[in-house]
Amino acid sequence: MIVPRYYEDLSVLHENTMPARAYYIPASKRMDNLVEHREESDRMQLLNGTWKFQYFNSIYDVQDPFFEKDYDTENFDEIQVPSVWQMAGYDTHQYTNIRYPFPFDPPYVPQDIPCGAYAHTFVYHKDENAPKAFLNFEGVDSCFYVWINGSYVGYSQVSHMTSEFDITDLLQDGENSIAVLVMKWCDGSYLEDQDKFRMSGIFRDVYILKRPEQAISDYHIKTKIEDMLAKIELDVKFYSPANVKISIEDKNGAVVAVGSIAEEGTAVLEIANPELWNTENLYLYQLILETENEVIVDHIALRKIEIKDQVIYLNGQKIKFRGVNRHDSDPVTGFTISVEQITTDLTLMKQHNFNAIRSSHYPNAPFFYEMCDKYGFMVIDEADIEAHGPFMLYREEDTDYNRFKRWNEKIADDPAWEAAIVDRVKLMVERDKNRFCIVMWSMGNESAYGCNFEKALAWTKKFDPDRITQYESARYRNYDETYDYSNLDVYSRMYPALSEIQEYLDKDGSKPFLLVEYCHSMGNGPGDFEDYFQMIQDNDKMCGGFVWEWCDHAIAHGTAENGKKIYAYGGDHGEEIHDGNFCMDGLVYPDRTVHTGLLEYKNVYRPARVVSYDKESGELVLHNYMDFDDLKDYVKISYKLTQDGLVISKGKLSEVSVAPHSEGKISLNINVPENGKCYLKLIYQLKKEMPLLEKDHILGFDEIEVSQKDAKCQLAEKWLEKTSADSELQVNENDTQIHIKGREFAYTIDRRTALFTEMKFAGREYLNHPMELNIWRAPTDNDMYIKSEWRKAHYDKAYTRAYTTEVVQGKHGVKITSHASVVAETVQKILDLTITWTIDAAGKIDADIEATKDGEFPDLPRFGVRMFLDKKLADVRYFGMGPQESYRDKHQAASHGLYRANIGDLHEDYIRPQENGSHYDCEYVELNNSRYGIVASAEKAFSFNASYYTQEELEKKTHNYELTESDSVVFCVDYELNGIGSNSCGPVVLDQYRFNDVLFRFQFTLVPYVKG
């Protein structure tokens, strides 16, 4: 074999790598802008670019010494470094969540392990002031061997961590060659079973650092803040001792502290009356470390994170993590993420009120943390560890209890893995120890618990006692043994029900409760942000949470003929082991287009909320949910008063001082009309420009109904009014049909269904297909589990049948009453119905449907009528919650208004099609064109959905670009829909959002019309 089999040897994790150290970029002179422009340093030589590359299906196919200096690579392909080779057309894509993509046989991997051979030439000029050269790889998946000028340099693994080699003696002045052999898998892959597409290659930057002989090798910044004095301790290590001048400058460039050190040890500097860093005030000091031939510029954020009485404090202030889990993921570049891509993510996060990020489930590129310091995010830094696969091993006793009980046997509690697990934690902590945005170290994710994590936690706490530790998998254990949790500072949980959280707070509560993952944001959802928000705010021991997750993971495959982007997920590349679209679970689409779920999050976590408003006295009580800023310093507030969706007055509130986590009062007097649906909307805007945020950026809003006694939408009332038309209707009946004809209309009702089959008005047919009673919806991703119950109940096959029908004709119209039911093959009646249609002389249709559900059946997906309307009715006008989709448990980002849209604009284009685009709490909706239309209106608010796609089409197709439009506008007028929730990987829909009514009554009005 061309290389030693270190990739299957737990005793060899690295060979010839330098000791782990803090990340920094040196230069020959002071350079202050290295966070996002580090390549400008004259002591950093990037080796990124076009490299030669050859992919091998098996390590045994690598026969030639491609790493030799003069090896002819003419037959090699070319590849960009950094990149992943799957995105360059090699190998195949595979998405898997828990299951390993290879046999569980540690430390061994498949014998014919795929690999990639890289070769590159570069020019290197030696610098007499910086003669030492250190080769850095910031990310290589999974392990690699490296050569310089044909000489073997070393070996390393841990995909998402930096590996550094001293190559001083191997370089020559002028042209040099570098060769790298990257293995697709190694023994470390058993610890890299993260929920993501599996990708391979040199995916982060490769560079050489030029260093003086006498230079700093490592430094550790420690801060103590007491009584308006900041003490900065700088532990310094050297390659060879050097005189170091130390200075600290404030943001204006004024020197506030100086010191020096000349040998390994600790320098202590002090800053009086320091400015403290937090996520709302991003104050950074500049640290300058200067030796004779080198300057290192870093920054310091002075802050103190601590736990007192089970409550987390930052700088003495109680805080809440408004967090999100973020993977490195891009549909085109895969794991390879640039500064610009990170800036896009951080900007969107700031715009949507996040203040914290969990680096799930591995450390990010080092500049990511510098950017979080700069832009104001608290970070949970997570070790590159996930060993979820042992949970899925074959067990004779195949129960969840037994799986959880034995999960830790093979890795977490097997001492053979101690060195590998502790190594990964040490590498993370050592590299990122000087990044003050990091307030919490995480030992990894979903790997069970055991002796190896006890050791990792003990080392971490000893090395860095000032940060918090967390590891959610500590709750998984061998139930026959007792493990040491003393070095864990928080109790972390994923996707607990609210009742489970309350139980912990009531019975134990010995540590702060952290929602390390919650509100699984897959497809249409989540539907429970507001409920978790209330739980988090109601108890100080609840320190907040991190939503799962930031972005949909997908692979871009160009554009379909219909112009839609083609995004692929698990199973789309022919792989046998995959987890489908479970990777499509983000708050943004793969290209960072915003999901409606992100809008929902933003407004739930707005900086302020109305506690109460007395419209008589004008007293408005506000709560400030900021952790540090007084409301007057952060937010300016404007208001709009609307009547039936139209703005009738607006203005700005005077400045109001409200301390963080406190309430304050202000006066707002408005004149509310005597009639109509009236809402007062308060808009919170950013008062000042901030990094990544523009002044006047909208941070959220509150909406308060302020209607008087006649609180009815006048638009709806207009269509509900009795008409003055007074003409005799013609009613003709036969065994199957009832024909009703008036001066301008001709309707037909099918006696067998009690529903309309024809609806002609002014000579124009409105219905392309018969009306239906509808209890089904295209399952959302969050219907993942309940949909099996729904199908078992045959809800997806249900239809309406009528038994008896009575026709009563009067002077001003006709009333048709049917006893009917909703039925499906093999099961009993689902619903008993009394359906009454009252049609007046002008053609207005009043519906009254009384329903009784058989209590044996599960919650209904929905209940309403579905019409297939003339496709020319393409314009929509409605009074309800918009402009984006809204549901009974997902409408915090929507507000009441009079909205206009095109049918196509109402569709939310989820990559896996599903129920979408409904609008909640509506009283009136109108579909029309320039000549004619139809209105649905009701006294009691309803939901509606107008789409070019049937629910059958949404359910049948697996990708949005495959969707085919119907020949109709599919118009659903719904009494109710079941809640959205987050049950794709979370608790069931909360009781208050379930559609579990046994008795209900749906009354609404339909009015076809012609304009003019």
Where are these regions (language model features)?
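Extended substrate-binding grooves/exosites of carbohydrate-active enzymes
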Residues: 1-39, 88, 96, 151, ...
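Glycine/proline-rich low-complexity spacer/linker segments in large multi-domain proteins
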Residues: 2-26, 31-38, 153-154, 177-210, ...
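An acidic-aromatic loop/edge-strand motif
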Residues: 84-87, 92, 99-108, 157, ...
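Extended acidic/polar, glycine-enriched regions
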Residues: 172-175, 235-308, 678-719, 724
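Surface beta-strand/loop "capping" patches
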Residues: 213-240, 595-635, 721-735, 849
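Intrinsically disordered, low-complexity Pro/Gly/Ser/Thr-rich segments with frequent PxxP/GP/PP motifs
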Residues: 260-272, 645-675
